[in-house]
Amino acid sequence: MADKDMKWKTLSQKYLIEKPWLTARVDKVELPTGAIIDEYYVLEYPDWVNTIAITKDGMFVFVRQYRYAIGKTVNELCAGVTEKGEDPMAAAKRELMEETGFGGGNWQKWMTISANPSTHTNLTHCYLATDVERMDVQHLDQAEDIEVRLFSRDEVMDMLEKGEIWQSLMAAPLWKYFAKVK
């Protein structure tokens, strides 16, 4: 049996805010059933990237920074935003170098996920970089206050199990890593 077409039809779009880091719009849509949703809110973002970076001696490279929206200082994978027209892997390598000073190594696409496919237009491209090494100092933006932290495999697993990796887009590739790489 063939899958039925569940695609919605866009009847209209109205932009509410257009900023470099966030664009919000309200769409009027028609469902395959004929039902109309007059106000369906959509958030447009550039694609995001994050990297599980592991040094030659098996240490995981994390960043520690304050996250205003949740009011917490947290440990995270190195992550960032793709620039317009930028290849996601190039963006991930750039972000790792800028935020941590680490680079080089062996890179592979790990997974692609969505923060919220019902309201967000962007994807998060996750990478695994092994055998990275410190190659430079951090080159932070004016608004960034980031500490580089190195954790062992056991420490990262412990943070995951305790719910201390707050960002779900970072927890997912880490859980995949621990499920696949013994």
Give short role names for the model-derived ranges.
Residues M1-K19:
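Extreme N-terminal tail/first-helix region
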Residues D3-K7, Y40-Y45, N50-R94, L140-Q142:
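Conserved Nudix-box catalytic region and its N-terminal flanking loop in Nudix hydrolases
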Residues A2-W8, A35, T73, K84, ...:
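Nudix hydrolase/Nudix homology domain
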Residues E86-L128:
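A contiguous pocket-lining binding segment that forms or flanks enzyme active sites
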Residues R25-T33, N116-M135:
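Active-site-adjacent beta-strand/loop module that shapes the phosphate/pyrophosphate-binding cleft
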Residues V26-E30, A53, L128-T130, L150-S152, ...:
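Short, well-ordered beta-strand micro-motif
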Residues K14-N50, K56:
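Acidic, metal-coordinating catalytic segment for phosphate/diphosphate chemistry
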Residues T10, A24-V26, I37-E39, V63, ...:
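Hydrophobic residues on conserved beta-strands that form the core of alpha/beta folds
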